[in-house]
Amino acid sequence: MSGASLLKETGPREVFCGLTSIVWLHRRMPDAFFLVVGSRTCAHLIQSAAGVMIFAEPRFGTAILEERDLAGLADAHEELDRVVKNLLTRRPEIRTLFLVGSCPSEVIKIDLARAAERLNSQFNGKVTILNYSGSGIETTFTQGEDGALKAFVPLMPSSDKKQLLLVGTLANAVEDRLITIFKRLGIENVDSFPPRQSTELPSIGPETKVLLTQPYLTDTARVLKDRGAEILPAPFPLGVEGSRLWIEAAAKSFNVDQSLVTSTLEPLILRARKALKPYIEKLTGKKLFLLPESQLEIPLARFLHMECGMELLEIGTPYLNRDMMKPELDLLPDKTRIVEGQHVEKQLDRVRKNQPDLVVCGMGLANPLEAEGFSTKWSIEMVFSPIHGIDQASDLAELFSRPLHRHDLLNTKQLTST
Amino acid sequence: MELTLWTYEGPPHIGAMRIASSMKGVHYVLHAPQGDTYADLLFTMIERRGQRPPVTYTTFQARDLGGDTAELVKGHIREAVDRFKPEALLVGESCTAELIQDQPGSLAKGMGYEIPIISLELPAYSKKENWGAAETFYQLVRGLLKDSPKSESEHNPSKWKTEGRRPRVNLLGPSLLGFRCRDDVLEVQKILAHHGIDINVVAPLGAAPADIIRINEADANICLYPEIAESTCIWLERNFGHPYTKTIPIGVGATNDFLNEIHQLLGMELPKQEEEDGSQSRLTWYSKSVDSNYLTGKRVFIFGDGTHVLAASRIAHKELGFEVVGLGTYSREMARKVRDAAKELGLEALITNDYLAVEEAIKESAPELVLGTQMERHSAKRLGIPCAVISTPMHVQDVPARYSPQMGWEGANVIFDDWVHPLMMGLEEHLIGMFRHDFEFTDGHQSHLGHLGGHSTEKETKAPSFYQEKVQSSRPEHFPHWTPEGESELAKIPFFVRGKVRKNTEKYANQIGCKEIDGETLLDAKAHFNA
């Protein structure tokens, strides 16, 4: 491990809960539905996080607990059965239904695993009913995806086929591109998880090599390992270098000839570096402060430092899985300040004291920081944007240079007009 | 359990946050798990505020539940008071904290602070956002005024005359995340100033606890948003004898009535000419102008919060000459008033939380304009019907940069523009009517009605979505069938009435037991309904 300084902080936090993952998961698998068993707050949260109300019929909803549900648990189970039946009658196209646990459902101990089991036998294979927790008392923001994928793992068929499995939700175009590159390297059996249709689960077994595409899949990685799969240690595929090392980890494991790897990746790398150039000019030497939110903070900081020359003031992360992050931590410069957990007020004090040029933060904090004169970038944008892979490196850098560019644009205009 | 896809209102503690964030010098310690902090973005993103809401969340975790959560709450209260030095502290809990019963309000009160501490009990599993806001405002006002001398029998709203000063009133109810509150306050202030009435306190928006304490220095109260301020106004009336206005000045007629009411309350004479010309708003003339002829009898469907739908139905009916074909609200607290208003129009009010039920009702009543919330805007878009947004829940679109009140004279102007523009503008629609056989105006013509180009539900019914399947399957089996010739005749009808003609023709065919609709049936039906 590098000489990064690791600090733990506790206090008031300003981080989304795991329910928010539904916002991208429901788009990934159009035949799945996410039913939060929770409160009006949960419903309001997902609605607000989804931001614009653009969906005719969203593929998520909330079974809102009411006073009479709190009276007795048996009642709550009957109610849940009724809601699920109504929902499935209304939406016959649903193939997988996730019952998503929330803070209130966990505090009053509604056993969603048992509910899923019971409903599964009732629907007898027509719909698969799974459960996981997205509650704020158990999970942060992106951990919801970890929970959903983990719930899928027992359903994955076994296979002894030698194959590569990409784990974590990616934009379709990015995923296609990565698969194309692996095929050029002669790795033919490449599958991804979660699948684009919830019913088409990839297989898993002792000959499955797993590359994680997202850093927040700790539990999923563990249960995949339990099914015999091998998790290939690598940095995450963000930026040119991260993506190269990530692809090479697979290549090595599949015994791909190094010269083929070099000849395949070299042109992509050259092109990507060329595309990165204008953004590097913008970003280099600028001070970066990352507040904890998506778990992508460490790989992003690594890319922005290594390849774009940014100075790292602080990397906040909601929690740190040292094993999984080791390849990333190894690439960070000595004495990088990593803060696990959060005390949002103290952290904002440090932002003010350190005067970064760019702050990566959650949506609730962005405008107040802008009002104080800081340029900001929303963490949530990273989980929606196609940023993975060598070809996307310049797009990723652009996301961070845009706020700085905008800042300059508006300030220049103000100067000329006065 | 209630299945919700989209909701009109958040939980009650969001209402409390609206009050806290609207005010100065107030801090809210909210016992809530991680994730509930999402609420900050309602203020910083939707309202585009440059400050975080003054809220400290305890963000407890599962592992805290085994330990001493009460100590955790106290720690956060202590830190919040030290850091933010509020003049008054609100303490409450969100839905999950309610279940673990730490009673943070009592904990806070036991900590020996000098500042007023308002403990909020907002039952998250039975109440909603507006109720939470009203209750918070009421508790806050009550808490801050509890030591003020009560004088309900002595209060005389005309006392300003003998004291040789201008009358003064409080504006109660405007808050953040309320529909156009910021501009409504300015507009109402302007109108009152014009009539020589001073503003004592505006609350909660922009008020500090010190302002609340001098709330009873006013002669009367103006209840601008009953959803938020009615309970407070009633309490002030009972305890201090302050009368309050019941009319909400949205629309020309209501603004006039409002002025009448406040003049009467304060024992003032309303200037004569004001009463006669009735209006300083352009709405009246614009609505009378020949170009507005096309608005005659336009069928309009109204849904939103209580205050805005009541105002909208009056304006639509009395000031724009529309026909109201549907009226409803999600504000259960206002259900009775909305039911009464609907009854007067010969309608049954739709009181519901379910946006799909509203969408069904819109489809059923086949309006030409929908006045609703952002949810209805999306429903209307799917149905190809023009829509204007008149009510919360808030969307970034509802916080415009420009001055855009709903209340008063300028509010009436804004409403005229906002409602009429989504319909085609007068002359343009006349021309389309006159020249509808010209090739320019065939079905490909792009209108103002968005991507559907005014094709109404015709195209929509072909879309292979669940939503459409549901529509079709809900039709009874014996429903009359349109012959190709009937369909082609129907296609000649201008799109903006086509939906209505289709519906009427089917109704007529059903009545006379006709199974197939051709061109003749269509004409028969037209004659039947015109007769």
UniProtKB/Swiss-Prot annotation, chain A:
Stored Gene3D superfamilies: Nitrogenase molybdenum iron protein domain
GO biological process: light-independent chlorophyll biosynthetic process; photosynthesis, dark reaction
Listed SUPFAM superfamilies: Helical backbone' metal receptor
Keyword Nucleus: no
Pathway(s): Porphyrin-containing compound metabolism; chlorophyll biosynthesis (light-independent)
Cofactor: [4Fe-4S] cluster
TM stretches of this protein: none
Known partners and oligomeric status: Protochlorophyllide reductase is composed of three subunits; ChlL, ChlN and ChlB. Forms a heterotetramer of two ChlB and two ChlN subunits.
Protein name in UniProt: Light-independent protochlorophyllide reductase subunit N
UniProtKB/Swiss-Prot annotation, chain B:
Keywords: 4Fe-4S, ATP-binding, Chlorophyll biosynthesis, Iron, Iron-sulfur, Metal-binding, Nucleotide-binding, Oxidoreductase, Photosynthesis
Catalytic activity: chlorophyllide a + oxidized 2[4Fe-4S]-[ferredoxin] + 2 ADP + 2 phosphate = protochlorophyllide a + reduced 2[4Fe-4S]-[ferredoxin] + 2 ATP + 2 H2O
Listed name of the protein: Light-independent protochlorophyllide reductase subunit B
Chain sites annotated for binding substrate: G426, L427
HAMAP family for this protein: ChlB_BchB
Subunit-structure text: Protochlorophyllide reductase is composed of three subunits; ChlL, ChlN and ChlB. Forms a heterotetramer of two ChlB and two ChlN subunits.
GO molecular function: 4 iron, 4 sulfur cluster binding; ATP binding; metal ion binding; oxidoreductase activity, acting on iron-sulfur proteins as donors; oxidoreductase activity, acting on the CH-CH group of donors, iron-sulfur protein as acceptor
Enzyme active site: D291 (proton donor)
Binding site for [4Fe-4S] cluster: D36
E.C. designation(s): 1.3.7.7
Job description of the protein: Component of the dark-operative protochlorophyllide reductase (DPOR) that uses Mg-ATP and reduced ferredoxin to reduce ring D of protochlorophyllide (Pchlide) to form chlorophyllide a (Chlide). This reaction is light-independent. The NB-protein (ChlN-ChlB) is the catalytic component of the complex.
Cofactor binding notes: Binds 1 [4Fe-4S] cluster per heterodimer. The cluster is bound at the heterodimer interface by residues from both subunits.
Pfam families: Oxidored_nitro, PCP_red
Family assignment from sequence similarity: Belongs to the ChlB/BchB/BchZ family.
Pathway: Porphyrin-containing compound metabolism; chlorophyll biosynthesis (light-independent)
NCBIfam families reported in the protein's UniProt record: DPOR_BchB, PRK02910.1-4
Top-level class of the enzyme under EC nomenclature: oxidoreductase
GO biological process: light-independent chlorophyll biosynthetic process; photosynthesis, dark reaction
Cofactor: [4Fe-4S] cluster
InterPro entries the record matches: ChlB/BchB/BchZ (IPR050152), LI-POR_suB-like_C (IPR013580), Nase/OxRdtase_comp1 (IPR000510), P-CP_red_C (IPR042298), Protochl_reductB (IPR005969), Protochlorophyllide_Rdtase (IPR016209)
